[in-house]
From Swiss-Prot:
Organism, as annotated: Thermococcus kodakarensis (strain ATCC BAA-918 / JCM 12380 / KOD1)
Entry-linked InterPro entries: FluC
Catalysed reactions, semicolon-separated: fluoride(in) = fluoride(out)
Protein name, as recorded: Fluoride-specific ion channel FluC
Regulation affecting activity: Na(+) is not transported, but it plays an essential structural role and its presence is essential for fluoride channel function.
Amino acid sequence: MNLRIAMAIALGGAFGAVARFYISGLLPVYRDFPVGTLMVNSIASLILGYLYGLLFWGFDVPPDWRAFFGTGFCGALSTFSTFSYETFSLLREREYLIATLNILANVIITIALVFAGFMLARR
C-alpha cells in the first residue's frame, strides 16, 4: 500500500465517521428500534454496492477513489459493532421481537441495497 492510498483511506474514514455521528444522532432510536444504525449501514451498503457495480461493469475508478469510498468512507460510516451491541442490549432487555427485527432489517435491507447500488451503476 502506498502513502496516497493510505491517505485516501484515512480521509474517507474521517468523513465517514463524522457522517455516522451526525446521521445516528438525528435518528437514534424509535420505539426501542435503533434506526440510526440501520440508516448508516444502509447508506454505506448502497454506496459500496454502487462502487462495486462501477468496477464490475467496467468503469475506471482510480484506486485512490476506491480506497477513499470503499475502505475509508463506507468502512467508517457503517458499524457492525454498534449493530451487535444494540442487538445484544435489546436481548438483555428481553425485547426479543425488536432484536429479531433489528437483525433481519440490517441483513435484508443492507444486502438489498448493495444489489440496488450495483444495479444503479449499470446505467
